[in-house]
Design a protein with these regions (language model features):
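Gram-negative bacterial Sec-dependent N-terminal signal peptides
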Residues: 2-20
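Substrate-recognition/specificity elements adjacent to catalytic centers across diverse enzyme folds
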Residues: 24-234, 242-244, 249-257, 262, ...
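Second-shell loop/turn segments in exported
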Residues: 58-61, 107-122, 355-361, 463-471, ...
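Stable alpha-helical elements in mature extracytoplasmic
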Residues: 105, 109, 120-123, 127-130, ...
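Glycine- and hydrophobic-rich flexible loops that cap the catalytic core of alpha/beta enzyme folds
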Residues: 244-255, 261-266, 270-414
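Hydrophobic alpha-helical segments
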Residues: 247-249, 379-487
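Terminal end segments
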Residues: 457-462, 466-527, 616-735
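Charged, long alpha-helical assembly modules
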Residues: 556-635
Length: 735
C-alpha cells in the first residue's frame, strides 16, 4: 500500500469523527465556543488551573494549556505513540517506528474510537479540538509532522508511564530479524544488545508511600507522590469541571488525565511494577508450498503475513518509505529470532479500556470507587499507592495479569508449540498481591517486589505465582522500609524528610566488603599505602550524601568502576550485580576499582577529595528534549545521588560528551506530599520549571527548590490562589 493510499484511508476514517466532519471555519467556530466555556488561571509558578463547564471542556482547556507550555513535547510523545518519529528524525528512527506499528494501526484505532462510549468520545473530541485550537491561534508554533490532531489519536497513548510494555522489544534484535535474512542475527547486534543490558544505568521508576492515620501526628492519611522519570516528562496542573472533576498533579505531555496526583478526597501514585506481564513465545516455523506455518499442539497453523510501511524523512528532506513484511502468530507479532525459532511477543493491548481507566480513576473519591475503576483491568505496568480522606490506604498490583502455568519460567521465551504455555484469561484483582489498611500503618513501593510493601504485614511470596514479581528487593526498597519504620507521628514535613533521607543503603553492604579487601591486603603491597587515605575516609563515612561530602563522590565513582567490572559476569551467573559486586569480585578487583575512581576524580577535578555538589549538577540550557550540557554554563549543585545506590531522592546523572561534571536527566521529577484532612493540603516541586520556553521566568524558577528538596504550597482551592494569580484568560485570548 502506498503512502497516498494510507493517507486517504486515514482521512476517510477520520471524517467519521465529529470534529473532523466540518469545514475548517466550522471547526474553528466550534472550538471558539468551547473556549468560551473554559477559564485558565496561571499561578505565580506558571502552573495552569483549568476549569470547564463539562469534563470535555476541562480536557479542551487542559491540553491547550499544556501546548502553551511545551507543544514540542506533546508532538514528540504522539510521534512516538503513533510510530511516526522517523518522519521527523529520519531513518535512524525507522526501527522504533516499526516496533510501534506492530501493534498500533490507525485504521484499528479509528474503528475503536467509533465504538467508544459516548462520554469517552466527547473527551477525545475535546482533546483534538484543544490541540488544534492551540495551533490555529499560535501560527508561530510549527509542528514537525502532526499539523492536525484527530480524536482517535488519543487512543495511541493511553497510559502515563514513561516506558510502555512495547519498549521491552529489543530494537537491535528487531532490526536483525526484519532488516536481514531471518534467523541470522549478526554477532555485532548480539554484542551490542549484551553490552546495553549490562551497562551501568539509572534505575527508572518511582517512590510511593501511603501513611495511615494511625501513623500520623494529626490523624490524617498522607501520600508521597515521587515519580522517577526523565526530567520535564510531565506537566503539573489542575483540571476541574462542573461535572465533579477536580484533579491536580502530574500529567504526561499531551494526555488529558492527571497520571499521578490527587483530588479533594483521594490520591494515587503509580510505580513501575516488577510483575511479568509481557511474554515471549518461541515458535517452530515451517515452510510448506511457499507458505509459512507454526506448530501449536498437533496443529500446523498458518503464520499471518502482512505489510507495514514506515515513512521517514530522507537525507534530502523528502519523505521516503521502507516497507516490511511482518509476521504474527496468535501469541503476537514476531520480534526476533533465537536458537532457530521465531519469537512472538505478547502484551496487553486495550487502548479504549486503558484510556477509560486512566481518566475515571481521577474522579474516584474513595477506595471502593477507585477499585471499581480498576476492574477495567487495563493497567499492566504500574503498581498503585492509594490514600483517601476516609483514612484508608492501599497498595494495588497491576490489574492486567495473565493467568499462566507456573511450571514455566516466563522470564524467558516459552515453547509456543505447547498449548500449556498459553495465557488463560486474567487474574481476578483478589488473586494478586493487594493490601488495604495494614496494621503497621504504612505502605510503600519503590519498583521493588510487593513482598515488603507493608513490612511484616506484606503479602507472602509463597502465596503467589512466580510471575507476580521478576526483580525482588532493591536498595531503595530496603531504604524505604528503614525510614517508614522509624516513626509513628508523620507530618507532611517529616514525610518529606523521609523522602529525602540521605542514607545510601547499597553502600552499607558494599563498603564493608571493600574494607575487608583492604585490611586483608599485605602491608608490603603498594596499593595499601596508595589507598590508605581513601580507606580512612570511607571507613569513617556515615553513608549519607550531601553536597559537601567528598566520600559520596569517591563511593559513587568506586561503585561505577566496580559495576563495570561486574555487570557482565553477574548476568552470566544469573545473580544481581549488587550481589556479584559484594560477594564475587576479588579483593584485587575491589581495590583496583577504588584506585580507578581516585584517578578519575583527580584527573577531572584536581583531587579525589572533591565535594559531591561540585560534580553532581542540574542544568537547563534550552527547551530541547535532548539537551546539550556544558561545563562552562551555569548549573546548580544537587546533593542527592543515584537510586542505583539506594537514594530515595534519585538523581540520575552522568558525564556527557565534552563534560567532566555529571548532569542529571532523570530521577526525582515531580515530588508531592498530600495530606487528606477535612480539606486536602499539598506541597510539591517539579524539576526546573513549568514552561519549556527559555525566555519564560518559569523555565527554571523551581530549580533551586528542587535541588534543596524545598517543596512549595500547592494552590488547590480557589481561595489559596488569591494573591498568587499571574493571569486569568480563556483559550485563544492573546497575551
Amino acid at each position: 500500500m502506498r503512502i497516498g493510499t494510507l493517507l486517504l484511508l486515514s482521512a476517510t476514517c477520520a471524517a467519521l469523527s465529529a470534529p473532523a466532519v466540518a469545514s475548517p471555519a466550522a471547526d474553528l467556530a466550534r472550538q471558539r465556543a468551547t473556549a468560551a466555556r473554559v477559564e485558565i488561571v496561571r499561578d505565580d509558578w506558571g502552573i495552569a488551573h483549568v476549569h470547564g463547564k463539562s469534563d470535555a471542556d476541562a480536557v479542551f482547556g487542559m491540553v491547550y494549556a499544556q501546548a502553551e507550555d511545551d507543544f514540542n513535547r506533546i508532538e514528540a510523545n504522539y510521534l512516538t505513540a503513533l510510530g511516526r518519529t522517523a518522519e521527523a528524525e529520519g531513518e535512524k528512527a525507522v526501527w522504533q517506528d516499526l516496533r510501534m506499528k506492530l501493534f498500533v494501526d490507525p485504521a484499528d484505532l479509528q474503528a475503536r474510537y467509533a465504538k467508544s462510549p459516548p462520554w469517552l468520545k466527547a473527551l477525545m473530541d475535546a482533546w483534538a479540538d484543544g490541540l488544534n485550537f492551540y495551533l490555529a491561534t499560535h501560527p508561530a508554533s510549527k509542528p514537525k509532522v502532526i499539523t492536525r490532531f484527530e480524536p482517535w489519536m488519543a487512543l495511541s497513548f493511553t497510559e502515563g508511564s514513561i516506558g510502555g510494555d512495547v519498549e521491552r522489544i529489543s530494537l537491535g534484535e528487531l532490526e536483525a530479524f526484519y532488516g536481514k535474512p531471518q534467523m541470522q542475527a549478526s554477532a555485532q547486534v548480539k554484542a551490542r544488545e549484551f553490552a546495553q543490558a549490562v551497562e551501568f544505568r539509572e534505575p527508572t521508576g518511582s517512590n510511593g508511600f501511603a501513611i495511615a492515620p494511625s501513623n500520623t501526628k494529626d490523624g490524617h492519611a498522607l501520600l508521597l507522590i515521587n515519580p522517577h522519570t526523565s526530567f520535564l516528562f510531565r506537566s503539573e496542573l489542575q483540571m476541574t469541571s462542573d461535572e465533579g472533576l477536580n484533579a491536580y498533579g502530574a500529567a504526561t505531555w499531551g494526555q488529558f488525565f492527571v497520571y499521578q496526583g490527587f483530588n479533594a478526597h483521594a490520591g494515587w501514585m503509580h510505580t513501575s511494577s516488577t510483575v511479568d506481564v509481557v511474554d515471549e513465545f518461541a515458535e517452530t516455523v515451517l515452510r510448506k508450498d511457499g507458505k509459512l506455518f507454526y506448530r501449536y499442539g498437533t496443529e500446523e497453523r498458518p503464520v499471518t503475513v502482512s505489510t507495514v510501511e514506515v515513512p521517514y524523512k530522507a537525507a534530502d528532506g523528502a519523505l521516503a518509505t521502507k516497507t516490511f513484511t511482518v509476521y504474527r502468530t496468535h501469541h503476537g507479532p514476531i520480534v526476533r529470532a533465537a536458537d532457530g525459532k521465531w519469537v512472538a511477543f505478547a502484551m496487553m493491548y486495550k487502548p479504549v479500556e486503558a484510556l477509560e481507566q486512566s481518566f475515571l480513576r481521577t474522579k474516584a473519591v474513595d477506595y471502593d470507587s477507585f477499585l471499581k475503576v480498576a476492574e477495567l483491568k487495563a493497567n499492566s505496568s504500574n503498581n498503585t499507592l492509594f490514600a483517601d480522606d476516609r483514612g484508608e490506604v492501599a497498595y494495588l498490583h497491576p490489574q492486567f495479569i495473565p493467568r499462566r502455568d507456573d511450571r514455566f519460567d516466563y522470564t524467558k521465551p516459552v515453547d509456543g508449540a505447547d498449548p500449556a504455555t498459553d495465557w488463560k484469561g486474567l487474574h481476578a484483582l483478589s488473586e494478586a498481591p493487594h493490601l488495604k489498611n495494614p496494621p503497621n500503618g504504612w505502605l510503600m513501593n519503590t519498583n521493588n517486589w510487593p513482598y515488603s510493601a507493608a513490612g511484616p504485614y506484606s503479602p507472602k511470596q509463597a502465596d503467589f505465582p512466580r510471575y507476580m514479581d521478576s526483580v525482588g528487593e532493591t536498595p531503595r526498597g530496603v531504604h524505604a522500609t528503614r525510614v517508614l519504620s522509624a516513626r509513628k507521628d508523620f507530618t507532611p514535613s517529616t514525610l518529606i524528610a523521609a523522602a529525602y533521607d540521605p542514607y545510601l543503603t547499597a553502600f552499607a553492604d558494599l563498603i564493608p566488603t571493600l574494607s575487608k579487601a583492604y585490611d586483608e591486603t599485605p602491608d608490603d603491597d603498594p596499593v595499601k599505602a596508595r589507598l590508605a587515605p581513601q580507606m580512612v575516609a570511607l571507613k569513617a563515612w556515615d553513608l549519607k550524601w550531601s553536597a559537601t561530602s567528598t566520600e559520596t563522590s569517591l563511593a559513587v565513582f568506586w561503585g561505577e568502576a566496580l559495576w563495570a567490572r561486574s555487570a557482565a559476569e553477574a548476568k552470566k551467573a544469573g545473580v544481581s550485580t549488587y550481589v556479584y559486586m559484594a560477594e564475587r569480585t576479588t579483593p584485587a578487583q575491589k581495590l583496583a576499582a577504588l584506585a580507578e575512581a581516585s584517578d578519575r576524580l583527580a584527573a577531572d577535578f584536581g583531587d579525589w577529595r572533591t565535594p559531591w555538589g561540585q560534580i553532581n549538577r542540574f542544568q537547563r540550557n534550552d527547551g530541547a528534549i535532548v539537551q546539550t550540557f556544558d561545563d562552562t554554563k551555569p548549573s546548580i549543585p544537587v546533593p542527592f545521588a543515584s537510586g542505583q545506590w539506594g537514594s530515595l531522592a534519585s538523581f540520575g546523572a552522568r558525564r556527557y560528551p565534552g563534560t567532566k561534571k555529571y548532569y542529571g536527566t532523570s530521577g526525582n521529577s515531580f515530588v508531592a506530599v498530600v495530606e487528606f484532612g477535612p480539606k486536602v493540603k499539598a506541597l510539591a516541586v517539579s524539576a526546573g520549571g513549568e514552561s519549556g520556553d527559555p525566555a519564560s521566568k518559569h523555565f527554571t524558577d523551581q530549580a533551586q527548590r528542587y535541588a534543596k528538596g524545598e517543596l512549595r504550597t500547592v494552590y488547590f482551592y480557589p481561595d489559596q490562589l488569591t494573591g498568587h494569580v499571574e493571569r486569568s484568560y480563556r483559550p485563544g485570548e492573546g497575551r
